[in-house]
Amino acid sequence: MSQQQQGAEQAPDLNNELQTRREKLAALRENGIAFPNDFRRENISEDLHAKYDDKTQEELEALNIDVTVGGRMMTRRIMGKASFVTLQDMGGRIQLYVARDDLPEGIYNEQFKKWDLGDILGARGKLFKTKTGELSIHCTELRLLTKALRPLPDKFHGLADQETRYRQRYLDLIANEESRKTFQIRSQVLLALRSFMVSKGFMEVETPMMQVIPGGAAARPFITHHNALDIDMYLRIAPELYLKRLVVGGFERVFEINRNFRNEGVSPRHNPEFTMMELYMAYADYKDLIVLIEELFRTLTQNILGNTLVKYGEQEFDFGKPFAQMTMKEAICKYRPETNIADLDDMDKVVAIAESLGIEVEKGWGLGRVQCEIFEETAESHLIQPTFITEYPAEVSPLARRNDANPFITDRFEFFIGGREIGNGFSELNDAEDQAERFAEQVRQKDEGDDEAMFYDEDYVTALEHGMPPTAGLGIGIDRMIMLLTDSHTIRDVILFPAMRPQK
């Protein structure tokens, strides 16, 4: 049966069920308050299971524990004068035992039996163990708190349709325990990140989301218009330049966890709206960041997952040991063995290598840009184990400090896990004159048609002219980090409401 045929057959059933539920709601309205708000929940299923799952029925009977729970009715088995209900709340599920003779007269037959799966209930009663040993609540009070007008997505198989999972995340969270777990871990990671950063002496700050000049990354921005000021503004592509202004101002260790926006494509690794953590620390260089990153991942995995070994599909990452390190040119030669490392310093030869890989070398690209394109094509997807790639060319690193021994490269790295870039860090460029020259080069590239090239930010150059101490800066993609920690293989699985094309 095609999906169209199946949908056509299901539509009348759904319409009938919607009508039936609306009639039940109408009856509730006639009888009084249809959506009461005087019920107070005192217990969460997860806490009850943690505290009492190991108790015997005799122990529970002796303890005589009264509990009050609230949640969504997920299953119900009516067996004459008694029923079992599965109630789902924020912590998980717990079973209710509902007996006609233990409730006020008329509740069981005239109300409870007419309720539907998906309805939100409040229940009071005593904890006990069933004959099969399942912790349950013997209800002495049961109330309908919210009438669900639409049925649960699937009574038996959960919510499998990916499109629906993303468009109607609330259904996904109701139906799929794994999705709830993913976003619980996400919340824990954000909390742990903040705790880690504060423990290292960093101060959390907030910088503008709308900017007159977008900067801090090579990306196409979203444009909006400020009516009162009558100017175009940009949703930020990165907070970097504002955070470094704060370092100039004397806040020597700052970080921000917030959204960035890039007007680019959607893929399993990209969402136009995404979460980043950026940090800046004065009197440090990129090598200090490497140590910090290794400690950060070691701490997060141990504290949240209970183990520094993280499984991701068929792969396993060990965050308990130092990451591997390679230069960009070393990585190219490793994963394209026929490459002579000396050839990577010859423009004609790198262009030939690029073209042999199907890379269309654009006018205006210099040696460093072509090297970077070759690296992305040949090496990036092979960097499975945690790896730092160092010595990025200055041409593709307009905000990074040049290397003292070789000004063609910068004191910069990107780190990769599972074949994906997770973060980018470098010793910051604090030479105002060099920064002005690099901004001018970015403007030239933009004039030649590169819509990802940076704007010239005169105020930022002015800030550097006041003096910024030696500083190291880092950006980490939080969504990709969450993907690793939750074994999720598309970014949409770790963003509650990912960008979607509108339904027709």
UniProtKB/Swiss-Prot annotation:
| Compartment list | Cytoplasm
Any single biological process term in GO: lysyl-tRNA aminoacylation
List ligand-binding residues for Mg(2+) 1: 414, 421
Query: Which keywords has UniProt assigned to this entry?
Result: Aminoacyl-tRNA synthetase, ATP-binding, Cytoplasm, Ligase, Magnesium, Metal-binding, Nucleotide-binding, Protein biosynthesis
**Taxonomy, superkingdom:** Bacteria
Subunit arrangement?
A: Homodimer.
The family assignment reads: Belongs to the class-II aminoacyl-tRNA synthetase family.
| Protein name (database record) | Lysine--tRNA ligase
Q: Which organism is it from?
A: Photorhabdus laumondii subsp. laumondii (strain DSM 15139 / CIP 105565 / TT01)
